[in-house]
Structures are given as C-alpha cells and as structure tokens.
Amino acid sequence: AFPEELPRDVISQIFASAADVVREAGGTIAGGHTIRNPEPIFGLAVQGVVNPNNIFRKSGALAGDIALLSKPLGTGVVTAAGTDAEKRTAIAGMRTLNRRAAESLQEVHEAVHAVTDVTGYGLAGHGWEIADRSGVSLVIDTANLPLYDGALRLAQSGHRTGGDARNRLYVEGRITISADDALVALCFDPQTSGGLLAAVAPDSVRDLVSSGLWTRVGEFVDATPGIVLR
C-alpha cells in the first residue's frame, strides 16, 4: 500500500530491493496486490515446502546442550538512541539473513536439538520459550553476549525501549538474575531481524563457533524450566 504522491521510482526501488533479498534467501516473488494508502505499507507472505525431518523446533533442548547465538544483540536500543554510525552497523546486521547460520546447523542436524529466532521478546524471552517447551533451564553467561556497537554504552547510560518492560513481565517468576544491569537489559532488548538461538550438543559446538557464524552464550541444564542470567 502506498500514497498516491509517492514517486514511482521509490516504489520501484522498494519492490526491487525486496526481490533481491528474496532471491538471496532462495525464493521467488509470485504475484501481489497494491492499494492506495496515506502511509506506505509493505510486506510479504512466505509459502514453501519442507521435509518434516529437517524442521528445527523450539522444543527438544537437552540438559548439557550449549546455547549458541548467530547475531549480536542491541538493535532496539541502538536504533532508538545510538549514533548514526552505530545505527548503520546495526542496520547492516539487521539486513543480513540467517540463511548461512541455518545452513551450518543443517550440516550437523542430528546435534541440533532446538532452534528459535530472537525477535521481539529478546534473548531472555525467546530463550525461555525453548526452556519451557524442553523441560530444562537456560543459563545465559552475559559476559559472552555478542553486542552491536554502542549497545552496552547505551544500556549503561540507562536507555531502554518500551519493549524492555514488557519482556521482563513475560518471564516474571521464571527468571533468576545475578548479572550486570546493563547486560541484563540487553537480554530483554527487543530485536528486529535478530539472530538464531540454538541448543546444540557439545561435540558439535567447536566447529560452529570457529565458523564465525555463532557465539556461545550459555548452556541448558537439568532444572525446573526457567532462565538464569549470570
């Protein structure tokens, strides 16, 4: 949906850029519908066929699995209050697909027990979803978190997004915190185009981390389902 006064070349650039990303992801745009609207609205619906044996689910993490994250944290706070340079770095990360990370998991498919993407609920919220569905607890080592430029500085200065408070409520009563306040805040920071969070058997972790696509951020332990930030 686009306003009538929006130049046609701008609309063409939006469609062309979307097509480029879809091709990069291995897809094809087929059809569409455009209407007039005072504000621009653009989105895609994805359809596909998948081998049911190759689906990664939120459930299935085992005690002893290592938690790996494929992108830095901090898009929420950086895009809200970061410098122009910091925003550019975060946007570049947001524009990067998770395809390579997902393909690397397929290479060790049997060792991957659960996967989700880190988006609006932040690392803590989406980590809780895996822990809850798997019947284990997720311990996050906040000192190991990969962060976008400026994210820690902004969090230390007290910058928070509106999603921070909502995400804390989402895991209220299910979380134990003993970490630095700023790093805790980044675990609750809502992400746009965040990375994948994977529960992986220890024997396969070294190769994934050495690929440069993944960072070890914690482990799943045999305990009442919950989240520990330490």
Regions found by a protein language model. Give the residues of each.
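Glycine-/charge-enriched secondary-structure boundary and capping motifs
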Residues: 5-28, 35-42, 53, 107-112, ...
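Phosphate-binding glycine-rich loops and adjacent basic patches that engage nucleotide phosphates
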Residues: 59-69, 84-92, 112-116, 166-174
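Active-site glycine-rich loop that binds ribose-phosphate moieties when present
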Residues: 45-55, 86-108, 181
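Glycine-rich phosphate/pyrophosphate-binding loop regions near the starts of catalytic domains
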Residues: 1-88
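Short hydrophobic/aromatic-rich motifs at helix boundaries and adjacent loops
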Residues: 72-76, 96-100, 123-124
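Generic alpha-helical secondary structure signal
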Residues: 9, 84-88, 92, 99, ...
